[in-house]
Amino acid sequence: MNSLPAMKTVTLNNGVEMPILGFGVYQIPEDQTEQAVTDALAAGYRSLDTAAAYQNEESVGRAIRNSGIPRDELFVTTKLWVQDPGESNTKRAFEASLKRLGLDHVDLYLMHQPYGDYYSQWRAMQDLQAEGLVRAIGVSNFHTDRLMDLITHNDITPAVNQIETHPFYQRQADHDFMREHGVQHESWGPFAEGRNNLFSDPTLTSIATAHGKSVAQLVLRWLIQRDVVVIPKSVRPDRMAENLDVFDFELSAGEMALIAPMDTNASLFFDHRDPRMVSFLGQRRVD
């Protein structure tokens, strides 16, 4: 979309540039993913976020190939699911993702969950980066204690940590920790799936109306002004375009301060430290 301002990027800890706003495909059915990604690319998105666990990498890859957009203009993220122990299993899983995507490399490879033999997984991911198959590696859903453990005992510090972040779970302490250690904060679930009546919240609605924007645009702008990478999803082209149109206004310090008290400091979905969730996610396998 040529009328939109230029996309802002963030510089990861190894110098790789990543768009601050991308398109996510979580929970988009396989039979709708190719069209959704095609529409997103046509709207102007150049960063795409998928995962082996989403089971739609093949559709993402087809949309990329059919778009005609040069590969070096795209930033593609996928994720490693919890693997059986051993570095070879991680490399096998990566090769399967790469084949499904139909690419010769990905820009960012994330460890999807902080479970299992994550040391072996991380060593394998370091090898993939050294081999040029991945431009940057990172993690997802890591709390600061486990993130610090990974940083302390490995050669490469994760470039990104993708975690649940929205107005009701703002993750300010995590954000400050990651900034201190050179890890880019990335949000999943920026709209909290509409929970807690996010789209009709009086505070968010009032601020959005003052700028002539939607609540969704306001939330994305709030995250971007915190230097948080965000990957909203939609299957509607009009919403895709709307979500991109967030670079022509700025929230004041006072407006940012009005949003801060909305933080409940708790997940609206599930706690990654809950033993039941650890067991459930840790035992699931993705081919």
Question: What are the residue ranges of the model-derived segments?
Answer:
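Beta/alpha (TIM)-barrel catalytic core signal, keyed to glycine-rich beta->alpha loops juxtaposed to Asp/Glu
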Residues: 9, 113-287
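CE4/NodB-like, metal-dependent polysaccharide N-deacetylase domain
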Residues: 90-111, 127-131
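Acidic-and-aromatic substrate-binding clefts and catalytic sites of carbohydrate-active enzymes
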Residues: 28-31, 50-59, 83-88, 114-119, ...
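N-terminal binding-site loop/beta-alpha segment at the start of enzyme catalytic domains
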Residues: 1-74, 191, 285-287
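Structural motif
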Residues: 39, 43, 100-101, 132, ...
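Short, acidic/polar
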Residues: 28-40, 86-101, 120, 145-147, ...
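A short, structured active-site edge motif that brings together acidic residues
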Residues: 71-84, 107-114, 141
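A structural motif
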Residues: 45, 103-106, 134, 158
